[in-house]
Amino acid sequence: MIKRLIHNTIISTVAFGAAAILGLIVIPVIIRTWGVTEFGLIVITRLLLPSGMMAVLDLGLSEVATQVVARAREHRDWKLVGRQLSFLTVLSVLLAVAMSGAIWLGAPYLTMLMKVDAAHVDRFTDILHYTALANLVLVPALVWEGTVKGFERYNLLRISEFASTLAYVVLTVWASTVSASFEIVAYIYLAALVIRALAVLAATITALTTKGARFAAWTTQTRRGLLHRCLLLLQGKLIGGITGPIQPFVAGLFFGPMGVGTYDALVRLARVSKVLVGLLTSALLPVASRLDERGSSTTFQRLGELGLIMLPMFTLPPLAAGAILSPEILQMWIGPLLAPYALWMGLSFVIPICTQYLVIGNVIFLTRPGVQARLNWLLSVQLLVWAAVAAATLGFFAERSLILGQAVGSLVVLPWQIDTLRRALNLELRSFIRAVGIQAAILIIGSTLLWFLASYIRVDSLIKLALVAGTFCLISWVAQYLLVLEARHRAVFPAIGHLMGLAPKSN
């Protein structure tokens, strides 16, 4: 099981990393060809997809489907799975019809709310209509994708994701070279997503057929159990979504497409890094579900402890480097257009930095409703802090006040979120505080030195950027390995090597 987890994690890292790079490459192409306003309009329409703002309303269909299939691989009751997936499928279709109808009928009102100018109204409305139609496929696809994740077939998911992203980027570059209208970019993106969803559907049917699972009428007990999980996930997604994917929509309400384009460009790199780490841990959900089904509490605890200490060890240095070197990154990536806002791009990295301590706990405790409810409550506190800070600074910083609110809210609530996970994992307080404290000190001191160094060295190429950031990360990793990790943590590395056949077993 652990070997499969490592294998799936590597697949997710490589495939989504490549797809993320392609996605970042295409943003300056869109902005330079069609403008920030047009880019903002494209972003607004993507918010209405399950991968965007609408994710807060998806009832956790993908996560619940993953848990259902993963648990079935332990208890082997595939008839029960058939009933459960039947209910989730019907629920997803009803949700898709409701979402699509709301988008189609609400298109005229959305153009007014987003302050779309007369020159773009008709084309923007057409994109909204096609987005509504695409959701009829993309919302049920959440169940299909969750099913494939439950079988831990991450190679298929990531390959299809990379292929669809590559097709989108290539066709967008082509549209740029032939001076096509900006709405073509939106249509290319929708087509790529729908084709990928159909490929995942084929994989879902194949996997379920192999196990002999058949769709069947569900029982009242099945319906109540699944609805309870869905509503609990909905609560967390609603709260988390307001401080995440809904923010570009809020920027559009106050500042129009230009504000959306500016906001999205400033937070895109930090958001991609956050999603990338989320995908690294997405392979954990089926494993955690199977461990919970088995009652393997010791392994479950060990998994959570490694996530709280070792994941930040690897992921925080690149994020800190991205924050400190934001002026250089923004200049090379977008150009001089948004260079004056580099400070805000750096501030946006605070959000994924805070998330690193929570991401694995948030995933594995999807199987523990009590802990999840506590985390949801803390998210609501974070939301209140975000709203207060953003409202107080909206007149000073425009759309950038949303970034400030997120950063402050994340920092204020983080200690309580970490403590909730520590208590749930029964970790000893003193040793845990020591590990996190030393880790924070290393990163603060290292980031300060990097900031001074960046003011003296001209970082004006990707090679120089990679060398400076890479050196910083390497020094940070070595320092944390020596000063933060205990012997039992370090033992994980040779164990993984043995498991993957990369190191000989000791006698």
For the regions a language model picked out, list residue spans one by one:
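N-terminal membrane topogenesis motif
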Residues: 1-24, 32, 62, 79-87, ...
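Interhelical loop/hinge segments that connect adjacent transmembrane helices in multipass membrane
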Residues: 1-5, 182, 186, 200-245, ...
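Membrane-water interface segments that mark the loop-to-transmembrane alpha-helix transition
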Residues: 4-19, 58-112, 126-132, 297-318, ...
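Short runs within selected transmembrane alpha-helices of multi-pass transporters and secretion channels
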Residues: 15, 19-23, 27, 46-51, ...
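Interfacial/gating helices of multi-pass transporter permease domains
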Residues: 30-53, 84, 182-187, 222-233, ...
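Helix-loop junctions and terminal segments of transmembrane helices
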Residues: 58-75, 150, 208-213, 266, ...
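Interfacial segments at transmembrane-helix termini and the short loops linking adjacent helices
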Residues: 107-131, 313, 322-354, 425
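Membrane-proximal transmembrane or re-entrant/amphipathic helices at the cytosolic face
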Residues: 423, 427-429, 451-507
